């Protein structure tokens, strides 16, 4: 706690330019939507290493207690997220954690901006995290029925790695990281659309197999 408090003056002296801050928030919000605990722990470690100048309002992320708790939960999630079916329950519950926390981080990170800019950043952070989380959940829902567990594990490992990589990469190349997120959001939009269509076709096929007539369309 004393060490973290001592970091506050140092972090307050070094600030990211507004545009770079927004770019970092875009990348970290997406990362939080994939894996919140890995993202928060990585942010805290990068700040303590002097790689990322966090705003004074986010110095709480540099507390060793916060880093330790997030790292411990990440370790639990690392295994829980790779169990077919259970991962869907885990991700469903985290809809109410990842998105609000990502929005809160964006809100506190932009405390020095105008109220309207802060509100816009908060909403953007929440929406980006929701898009990443929604895309992850949709793909998992499509993969879970598969009899082999390897695809689920590979997806989970990829998501964990991407969350950590994006968080770090945003500190080195914020604009490139934000551009990557933009591309990923477009891919997610197409993936979600494909998953929804596939699930509809699956349900229609199941209805036909069971001999349940679908209601006529008008």
Stretches found by the model and what they are:
Residues 100-109, 118-138, 161:
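Mid-bilayer segments of alpha-helical transmembrane spans in multi-pass integral membrane proteins
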């Amino acid at each position: 706690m004393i060490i973290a408090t001592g970091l506050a003056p140092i972090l307050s002296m070094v600030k990211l330019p507004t545009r770079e801050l927004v770019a970092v928030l875009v990348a970290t919000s997406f990362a939080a939507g994939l894996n919140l605990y890995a993202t928060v722990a990585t942010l805290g470690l990068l700040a303590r290493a002097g790689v990322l100048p966090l705003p004074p309002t986010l110095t709480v992320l540099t507390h060793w207690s916060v880093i330790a708790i997030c790292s411990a939960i990440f370790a639990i999630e690392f295994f829980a997220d790779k169990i077919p079916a259970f991962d869907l329950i885990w991700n469903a519950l985290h809809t109410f954690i990842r998105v609000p926390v990502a929005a809160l981080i964006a809100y506190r990170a932009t405390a020095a901006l105008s109220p309207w800019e802060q509100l816009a950043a908060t909403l953007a952070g929440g929406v980006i995290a929701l898009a990443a989380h929604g895309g992850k959940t949709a793909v998992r829902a499509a993969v879970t029925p598969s009899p082999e567990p390897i695809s689920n594990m590979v997806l989970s490992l990829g998501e964990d790695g991407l969350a950590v990589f994006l968080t770090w990469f945003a500190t080195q190349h914020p604009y490139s990281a934000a551009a990557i997120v933009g591309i990923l959001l477009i891919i997610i939009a197409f993936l979600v659309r494909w998953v929804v269509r596939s699930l509809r076709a699956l349900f229609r096929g199941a209805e036909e197999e069971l001999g349940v007539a679908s209601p006529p369309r008008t």
